[in-house]
């Protein structure tokens, strides 16, 4: 569900770390969580251990590889050691594994042992024109792409590539620079931090598809359960994106300004409705417009009315579910 807490993050709240999760509906699966550094960051280990039944959690204390920076071992070493763990599992038992990378996060470390990855010698002007803030960041993103390729090679060599659904996503974005190929709305309406990549890769199982609706990370677990053919019960906000949304065109709730008095939003493929947390000052914005700050509520009264009702409902339901979903 969306984290709509108004102080810190939900994982830091000791009463919210024991949540019902669809992961527990993956009956008969080995469940693993691997992170290159300290799993105690933001109290994540409490959430993982208390919410996921029989989970095997691996962090910096379990790895043989050297730490390269504050985030622990390198992503490449994390992939290699995780691959060895997955290969050692019983061949007839499925697994649900979460591998948390950190290499494209500051300080953008390029480890010495990187399987031949070549740093690109670009100028600051060149990388900033393409959307990166620094040469270091540019090469860190390139390294992440390289490492994902190595992960796929390891999975193929390990014999589990063809029967595995790989999910690649970012937990959040960050302001980098103004990017010409992105619509002005992402910068001017503050959507860049919420706009993250999401790739589901299983060519032998799923084929190919582009989802052009607005979807959120809360939709990820029910979607994966649907793809795996699992029966599941959800007490949270996520929906299987393979199924039609009951509200018609799908709406994703957002928090656009955090804090005690947040600015909340409901985003669709084409529009963003934003309002104060108490429902006041609602405005509707066209995401494809060259002037996205314009309020287009009068030109689109039906969509404005639909989102004006849904947005606070989704936000307040998310707040309630953080407590109602506790096991």
Listing of model-derived features with the role each one plays in the protein:
Residues 1-327:
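Solvent-exposed soluble domains appended to multi-pass membrane proteins
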């Amino acid at each position: 569900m969306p984290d709509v807490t108004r102080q810190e993050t939900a994982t830091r709240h000791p009463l919210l770390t024991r949540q019902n999760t669809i992961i527990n509906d993956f009956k008969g699966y080995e469940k693993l969580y691997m992170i290159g550094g300290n799993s105690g960051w933001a109290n994540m280990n409490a959430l993982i251990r208390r919410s996921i039944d029989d989970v095997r959690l691996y962090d910096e204390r379990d790895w043989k590889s050297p730490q390269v920076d504050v985030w622990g071992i390198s992503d490449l070493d994390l992939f290699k050691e995780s691959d060895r763990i997955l290969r050692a599992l019983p061949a007839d038992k499925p697994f649900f594994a979460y591998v948390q990378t950190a290499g494209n996060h500051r300080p953008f470390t390029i480890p010495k042992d990187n399987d031949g990855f070549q740093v690109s010698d670009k100028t600051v002007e060149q990388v900033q024109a393409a959307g990166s803030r620094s040469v270091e960041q540019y090469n860190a993103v390139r390294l992440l792409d390289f490492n994902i390729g190595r992960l796929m090679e390891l999975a193929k060599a390990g014999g589990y590539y063809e029967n595995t659904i790989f999910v690649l996503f970012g937990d959040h974005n960050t302001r980098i620079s103004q990017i010409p190929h992105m619509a002005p709305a992402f910068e001017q309406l503050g959507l860049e931090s919420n706009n993250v990549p999401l790739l589901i890769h299983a060519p032998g199982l799923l084929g190919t598809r582009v989802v052009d609706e607005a979807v959120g990370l809360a939709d990820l677990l029910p979607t994966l359960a649907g793809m795996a053919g699992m029966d599941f019960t959800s007490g949270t906000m996520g929906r299987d994106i393979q199924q039609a949304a009951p509200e018609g065109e799908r709406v994703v709730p957002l928090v656009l300004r955090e804090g005690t008095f947040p600015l909340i939003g409901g985003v669709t493929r084409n529009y963003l409705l934003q309002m104060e947390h108490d429902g006041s000052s609602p405005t509707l914005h066209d995401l494809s417009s060259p002037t996205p700050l314009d309020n287009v509520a009068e030109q689109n009264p039906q969509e404005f009315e639909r989102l004006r009702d849904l947005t606070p409902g989704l936000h307040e339901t998310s707040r309630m579910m953080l407590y109602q979903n506790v096991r």
